[in-house]
């Protein structure tokens, strides 16, 4: 259970790096990743709704951010994936000394800490749904400034965000 986001508890000084096992890294990365996804989606999946994760906007945004970040770390896939998922879910495990990585990865990790996982998960951060809503609001306000008489609703999960929610 310590792989659940915000856990990060390890009795070892070198955390998960102590084991130096690709198998451990991938299993822990998987469980950290799913702990950053809305638990309601997992529940619906267990009830037989097998495609629920792929249909959920927030899950797709969260997964996209994670995949993009893994690719842009430009280090070994095993270490990059582990660190990215650990950072975005605020789990706190580590398997590599990312202080030795390129400087842009430090900025990326700070951004990932700020963004966080999905709503309804144990991950910290702003949450992927709020980031999605903010991006859509910025787009709608930009288009609205170009077309002041137009009406550009912001939709999140198929629903129009109210003006109170947009404020």
Identify the meaning behind each predicted range.
Residues 1-167:
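Membrane-proximal intracellular helices of multi-pass ion channels
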């Amino acid at each position: 259970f310590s792989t659940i986001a915000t856990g990060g508890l390890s009795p070892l000084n070198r955390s998960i790096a102590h084991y130096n096992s690709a198998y451990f890294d991938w299993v822990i990365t998987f469980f950290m990743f799913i702990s950053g996804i809305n638990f309601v989606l997992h529940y619906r999946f267990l009830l037989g709704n097998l495609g629920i994760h792929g249909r959920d906007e927030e899950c797709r945004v969260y997964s996209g951010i994670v995949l993009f970040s893994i690719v842009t770390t430009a280090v070994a896939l095993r270490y990059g994936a582990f660190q990215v998922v650990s950072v975005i879910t605020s789990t706190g495990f580590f398997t590599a000394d990312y202080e030795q990585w390129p400087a842009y990865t430090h900025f990326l990790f700070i951004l990932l800490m700020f963004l966080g996982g999905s709503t309804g998960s144990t991950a910290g951060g702003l949450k992927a749904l709020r980031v999605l809503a903010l991006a859509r609001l910025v787009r709608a306000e930009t288009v609205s400034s170009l077309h002041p008489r137009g009406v550009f609703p912001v939709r999140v999960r198929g629903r129009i965000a109210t003006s109170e929610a947009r404020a």
